[in-house]
């Protein structure tokens, strides 16, 4: 931690320190006996600079600001306009109001992420964005951040349709709250100049691998690039954890049924997941055939956290919660369904994901405007004292427990009844007003899939018990079950967690991503839309999405039937 934060600060993708960090990660892995390699690729990254901002009416006030990454630069004379407070910046904040021609004021919570706040502001006709920091009301830290919605490097299509289109700046919470109070008294006009260089640069990721007894493997990773400053929690701490896990697992390589791939990504902060998406794209065949799970480690052991927070695809939930209970005992813990944030570039591929770390209490979050990553997040205040090194030891033990079971279990520790239940619950929730789409048939297939999942889970439990009682048991059945579980995840994860599906990436923070089966997100709107062109086009889209759901659930039921038939 000290080495990274003091000798390689400001690890921006495309910078010399970004390259040095990639080389340091490779050297640390090599020293631990792990084969490592640095890969270089072109990345569309951003080098934002300090912005200039002031209130011009009703009084003139200068405000310290940072240009946000991938902001559109303003012209030399800047941008001025009337300010409108849109709070979280989500769609519902605009209801009954017009942002056309105005500059929006929003606050940093990740509901939605900055990237989505910008996208929504543009859709609503705004001309620019001012985003205030989170934290306690006295927080004077001026945040960095990115507003590029395109996940990874753009394609010709997404470059035209998903890149940021507005100039955006970040300001301290103290300044944002002052603007909010001024708006309560009447109109406020602001001016700002956004200064940024956006362009293609060579960027680097580091990948290390410990081979197991079979061709299958688990991926553990996190981003190694950072904003200016030490950025201790984000993500020097995560990188240090992966290095230590690699060192320990390398000493146990002869016991690993599955290998361990260690990924140190880049372009997370200033390129929106360039490194991890490149890795998935360029290792697709091997990942699709042999990757069993992805553990993301990003911002572990923030100072002041006391609970345990885990987010996963639900097929992993039972196994990782059991590991957490063994290691953490009575420490409060909670779970949420994994959504596509951080380096969740494996969703389209269909590899289930787990991310977990310490969390603040609800009371602490209320006091800090939902600063779940610390008031210092994305600022130069992110120094090494923002880490709880005692809690870090618990993090390492939990991560090791996750990886050990994933790498050594004879039968993968997945269960699919919970997956089926999520589909059933969501489809039932969406059914009112969805008659035109034929959702009943898809819901019926979800119930049939659940019955098949019950049979699969029972069979897997039976075989786990057999293998536990005899180390000499033939593992043919395990191979058949594991192959089925991987194929199920390949089909179910993209359906449950993406709108675009397997071969594209939804924009970062995309609002439908917060829901189960994002492709059906607009079903409630269909019932409220009058007959006419808009409704007919939306209905066409949703019928096709419904067909995708029905087909995947039916295909998964058939996979299970075929697997159980083979086992019998």
Name each model-derived stretch:
Residues 1-13, 27-33, 88-91, 98, ...:
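Catalytic-core environment of secreted peptidases
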Residues 2-103, 110:
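Noncatalytic luminal/extracellular "stalk/propeptide" segments of secretory-pathway proteins
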Residues 63-160, 165, 331-332:
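Extracellular/luminal Protease-associated
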Residues 393, 397-568:
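C-terminal non-catalytic alpha-helical accessory regions
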């Amino acid at each position: 931690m000290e080495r990274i934060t003091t000798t390689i600060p400001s690890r921006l993708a495309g910078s010399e320190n970004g390259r040095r960090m990639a080389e340091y990660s490779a050297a640390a892995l090599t020293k631990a006996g792990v084969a490592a390699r640095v890969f270089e690729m072109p990345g569309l990254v951003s080098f934002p600079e300090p912005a200039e901002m002031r209130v011009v009416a009703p009084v003139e006030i200068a405000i310290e600001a940072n240009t946000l990454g991938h902001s559109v630069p303003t012209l030399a004379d800047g941008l001025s306009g009337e300010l409108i407070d849109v709070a979280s910046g989500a769609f519902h904040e605009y209801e009954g109001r017009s942002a056309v021609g105005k500059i929006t004021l929003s606050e940093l919570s990740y509901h939605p992420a900055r990237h989505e706040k910008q996208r929504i502001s543009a859709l609503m006709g705004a001309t620019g964005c001012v985003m205030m920091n989170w934290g306690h009301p006295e927080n004077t830290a001026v945040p960095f951040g990115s507003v590029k919605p395109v996940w990874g490097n753009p394609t010709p299509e997404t470059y035209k349709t998903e890149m940021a289109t507005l100039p955006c700046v970040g300001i301290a919470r103290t300044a944002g709250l002052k603007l909010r109070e001024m708006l309560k008294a009447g109109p406020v006009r602001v001016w700002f100049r956004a200064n940024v260089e956006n362009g293609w640069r060579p960027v680097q990721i580091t990948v290390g691998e410990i081979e197991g007894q079979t061709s299958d493997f688990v991926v553990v990773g996190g981003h190694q690039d950072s904003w200016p400053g030490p950025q201790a929690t984000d993500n020097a701490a995560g990188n240090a954890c992966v290095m230590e896990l690699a060192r320990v697992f390398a000493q146990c390589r002869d016991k690993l049924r599955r290998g361990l791939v260690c990924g140190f990504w880049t372009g997370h902060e200033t390129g929106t997941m360039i490194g991890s998406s490149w890795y998935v794209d360029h290792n697709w065949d091997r990942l699709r055939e042999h990757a069993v799970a992805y553990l993301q480690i990003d911002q572990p052991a923030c100072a002041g956290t006391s609970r345990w927070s885990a987010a996963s695809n639900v097929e992993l939930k039972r196994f990782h919660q059991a590991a957490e209970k063994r290691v953490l005992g009575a420490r409060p813990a909670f779970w949420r369904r994994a959504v596509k944030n951080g380096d969740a570039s494996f969703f389209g591929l269909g590899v289930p994901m787990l991310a977990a770390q310490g969390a603040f209490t609800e009371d602490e979050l209320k006091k800090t405007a939902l600063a779940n990553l610390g008031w210092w997040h994305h600022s130069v205040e992110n120094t090494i004292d923002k880490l709880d090194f005692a809690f870090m030891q618990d993090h390492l033990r939990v991560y090791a427990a996750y990886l050990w079971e994933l790498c050594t279990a004879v039968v993968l520790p997945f269960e699919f009844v919970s997956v089926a239940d999520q589909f059933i619950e969501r489809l039932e929730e969406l059914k009112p007003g969805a008659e035109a789409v034929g959702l009943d048939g898809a819901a019926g297939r979800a119930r049939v899939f659940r019955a098949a999942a019950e049979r699969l889970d029972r069979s897997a439990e039976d075989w786990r018990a057999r293998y536990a009682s005899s180390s000499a048991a033939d593992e043919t059945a395990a191979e058949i079950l594991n192959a089925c579980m991987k194929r199920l995840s390949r089909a179910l994860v993209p359906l449950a967690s993406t709108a675009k599906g397997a071969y594209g990436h939804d924009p970062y923070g995309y609002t439908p991503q917060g829901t189960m089966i994002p492709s059906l997100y607009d079903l409630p709107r269909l019932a409220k839309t009058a007959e006419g062109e808009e409704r007919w086009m939306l209905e066409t889209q949703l019928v096709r999405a419904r067909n995708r759901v029905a087909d995947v659930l039916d295909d998964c039921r058939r996979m299970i039937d075929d697997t159980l038939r083979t086992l019998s």
